[in-house]
Amino acid sequence: SQASSGTPRHGGDGTVRVVRPQVSSLVFTGGTLTIDSDKGEITHSDGSFLLGQFSNKTYTAGDGTAYPYQVVTYTADTISLGSGVIINLIGDNPISLRTRNHGNLTLGSTINVNGGNDPSNVGGSGTAGGFDGGAKDVDGNGPGRGATKSVNSQGGGAAFGGQGKDLDLSYSQTYATAELSNHLIGGSGGGGGDAYGGGAGGGAVELFAHGD
């Protein structure tokens, strides 16, 4: 046999999991806090670390089109982010920041989830659940997407809680709910025009303090 002949037999590739200690609260007055909604991680420049939980969701538009998405929920005893904290939110998924055990949630800094502008005719990039804008001469993305070259060769505005500007009623329509109570989903992307791409829709962030 192979074993008796002295020929070594190697096992299959394994995996190594390194578990970092997590904080139970997010309380910071300064430094940089990075929220990565693709990895499901929050990291602070002082080394603090917290993992989120992914939830699979699907929004079905009025025309029957399904839009699957994921929400990342980060839960801590207390969340307090002072004005000196620089918050960087990266990744495609919308996020929910929640407290537990009747913990307080205080936000003194800014979480920017603005949709990106078109950099070079390819359409702006969305973050935190915002849909990408359409490239030059291409419709935007999302349930309330803007049409390409809608008015005077310019791209049509997209929608979410309010209707965007478009003469074609199959575009730029409102969807979900403005208060994000049913679906934590971002805004749609604008349509590309004759000369430029469309801007991306804004992202979605939920702040939830556990009640008494």
Q: What is each model feature region?
A:
Residues 1-71, 78, 93-96, 102-212:
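Glycine-centric low-complexity/flexibility signal
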Residues 81, 87-90:
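Structural recognition of beta-strand segments within beta-rich domains
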